[in-house]
Amino acid sequence: MFEIKARDAMGRLGSITINGKKIETPTIMPVIHPNPKKQTVSMDLINKMADVVITNSYITYTTPELREIAETKGIHELIDFKNVVVTDSGSFQLSVYGDVNVGPMEIIDFQEKIGVDVGTILDIPTGPDVSREKAESDLIETFKRAEDSIKRRKEMGYKLALNGTIQGSKYLDLRQKSAEVMGKMDFDIYPIGAVVPLMEDYRYREVAEVILNSKMHLPTNKPVHLFGCGHPMLFALSVALGCDLFDSAAYALYAKNGRYLTADGTLHLEDMKDLKSFPCTCKVCSEYTPKQLYNLEEKEKTRLLAEHNLYVTFEEIDRIKNAIKEGNLWELVEERCRSHPKLLNGLRVISKYMDFIEKHDPVSKKSGFFYTGYESMNRPEIYRHKQRLDRIQYDKIYVTSVSENTSKPYHENLSNVPCDVDVLIKDGVFGLVPLNIDTMYPLAQNEVPDLYDFEKKYNNEFVSEFKEKHSEKILDISTYNYYINHYGKKKECDKINPDVFRVGKMLEYQYGAKILDEELMEKVKTRRSKNTGRIRNLLLEKEVLFTLRANDNFLIPAKSGAELLHEKLEFPKYRIVIDSSVEEYARAGKSVYSKFVKDCDPELRPFEEVLVVNSDDELLAYGTTILNGRELMEFDYGVAVTLRGGLKK
């Protein structure tokens, strides 16, 4: 069972429950050698740091003394780990040696027998440099083994959860096919396999594309494990692309070769030995100088170096979790990807998939948008803004430029004449910023350095296309000046209320429809904050319809506002339909759980304000969804909507 608690980009801070044990994602599974004598780092430390580990059932199966202990006392006793134990099936050995001495069903039976929490099918790992014909034939065999494994578990009543590994080599259409076929089977976790050769060769562009082409066709309600990814420098990008689990043998393997892991790359202890101190404050690095560690006996040096590598690995995972909570995961990704040019390739290629990524990225975040380089131009926040500009119902448009020194929000620092013309400011990052919505996230909640000339030109094509699309409504400067002069001569009673007009445009941008018609425009009023002087509420006959949330200026409906949205928005827009059995709970304002969602607006994005209705489209409640439209239909566990209020009968 998987539940999302917080999110940013496609990264998910979540909770997996397996056999009554909980794993917080994203997380790393340290690889544990099934032979305790060969385990580099003590299991006492592993038990303190990890919620989940991964070990090899094939080595256990083929080593008589290990097999005997595992079969009599269980895998947890063998490796001395109390929480969730995942096992590989021998697929790695198959990829290295070309053959294994165990059958696909035999290894499933064995994993169940030794009490594994999450087992793995014996799939066929297909490297990146094989022919398409070979990749296709391997995939067909993996599908057969997967189907047989699921059938075996069901027929035998096995309790173990199962990994269904996605294969397909470097062929993206085969990765898609693998995800589609495997996704229809009842697997609990979906590892993306055979990417280690790509990572070893720094082919991060291909790694990113393999992840995305798999994610697009996998069920959203199941965790995704990037098999073999153990270097912390790749975690942030992989999490941002939707990976929840990683496994690391790197902490031990690198230590044996004297390699010192950092979040930005790998250093060699031999090259560091003359430094006064380590660039780390973990227990190992605090107690030893580089020279002291380097001069230790080999076995002890390897153990301590492995401990450091494990510390820095978990530290990066914790840093990513915090970034998800704070809403600045993209900034961390951009920072990490600048640590190596090949990683930057991985970041740049994802712009091709922004239509997919944007669907998972929250519409609003705790942190502002920080521009850290040219790649920031392709972030989902900007992509979404450009798409949603077409939600605004324009009558007359004037496009202009402002001085680079003009502070945001623009409308507070320009002498703009109030009228019913939509004035759009050319913006180097966001393309166009309508003055009437310029306080909404992320248009005012951003920090951008002085742009280079080539960056300033990035949005020229977008602006030209927008103007061409709306050419009949575009005013030139002479017409605009004539119009505002003419408008200024109108009687006060004939003029629009600029604050109400502004809020109307904000509602269009946020909800994609005209919420305030002409009649309402004359009836509603705004109320400004006494502290900031900014618009805080929209009212109808002294009753609050919407509150402009201070941090992002999104319009949050009160009960009457929700009723207005329900009236103005056509079904299924911004709706979530729930089962009749929980109608009364919704009316009472209690959270809506995923398993009770029957239908929804497929275009919903995470953290949008939604209307909760029954099958007759009767408004029951209103609140915020943590899931997008597709996820709402696929998740069957955890909270779907946090309600702000319910409508009692």
From Swiss-Prot:
The keyword Acyltransferase does not apply. Keywords: Glycosyltransferase, Metal-binding, Transferase, tRNA processing, Zinc. Binds 1 zinc ion per subunit. Pathway: tRNA modification; archaeosine-tRNA biosynthesis. InterPro entries: ArchSynthase1/Queuine_TRR (IPR050076), ArcTGT_C1_sf (IPR038370), PUA (IPR002478), PUA-like_sf (IPR015947), PUA_sf (IPR036974), TGT-like_sf (IPR036511), TGT_C2 (IPR029402), TGT_C2_sf (IPR038250). GO terms for cellular component: cytoplasm. The gene is tgtA. This is tRNA-guanine(15) transglycosylase. The lineage of its organism: Archaea, Methanobacteriati, Methanobacteriota, Methanomada group, Methanococci. It comes from Methanococcus maripaludis (strain C7 / ATCC BAA-1331).
